[in-house]
Amino acid sequence: MARITVEDCQKRIDNRFLLVQMAIKRVQQYREGYEPLVDSKNKEVVTALREIAAGKVMPEDLALYRPAEGEEMPVAE
C-alpha cells in the first residue's frame, strides 16, 4: 500500500496549516460517528489525510482548493 504524505495532500491544499486543521476536524467527525469516505484500515489521521489527498474532503473556502489535473472545480451548495 502506498504511503500518504503531507506532500500528497498539498497537491490539493497548498496551506499546511489549513491541511492540519482539516485533518483534525475530520478525525473529530470520525469520533462523533461519521463514516470514512475512503477504504482504509489505517489510523484516523492517516484516513483523514487519504480523504484529503483523494479530494473527498474540501475546505470551507473552496478558493483554497486546487482540483487535480483534469478534474473540475466543485460547486459550493
UniProtKB/Swiss-Prot annotation:
EC number per UniProt: 2.7.7.6
Record-level GO cellular component terms: DNA-directed RNA polymerase complex
Signal peptide: none
Keyword Nucleotidyltransferase: yes
Record bears the keyword Membrane: no
EC top class named in words: transferase
Keywords annotated in UniProt: DNA-directed RNA polymerase, Nucleotidyltransferase, Transcription, Transferase
InterPro entries: DNA-dir_RNA_pol_omega, Pol_omega/Rpo6/RPB6, RPB6/omega-like_sf
Pfam families on file: RNA_pol_Rpb6
SMART domains reported in the protein's UniProt record: RNA_pol_Rpb6 (SM01409)
GO MF, one example: DNA binding
Catalytic activity: RNA(n) + a ribonucleoside 5'-triphosphate = RNA(n+1) + diphosphate
Transmembrane segments: none
GO terms (BP aspect): DNA-templated transcription
Role summary: Promotes RNA polymerase assembly. Latches the N- and C-terminal regions of the beta' subunit thereby facilitating its interaction with the beta and alpha subunits.
Subunit text: The RNAP catalytic core consists of 2 alpha, 1 beta, 1 beta' and 1 omega subunit. When a sigma factor is associated with the core the holoenzyme is formed, which can initiate transcription.
Similarity section: Belongs to the RNA polymerase subunit omega family.
Protein name as catalogued: DNA-directed RNA polymerase subunit omega
Species of origin: Nitratidesulfovibrio vulgaris (strain ATCC 29579 / DSM 644 / CCUG 34227 / NCIMB 8303 / VKM B-1760 / Hildenborough)
Gene name, Swiss-Prot/TrEMBL: rpoZ
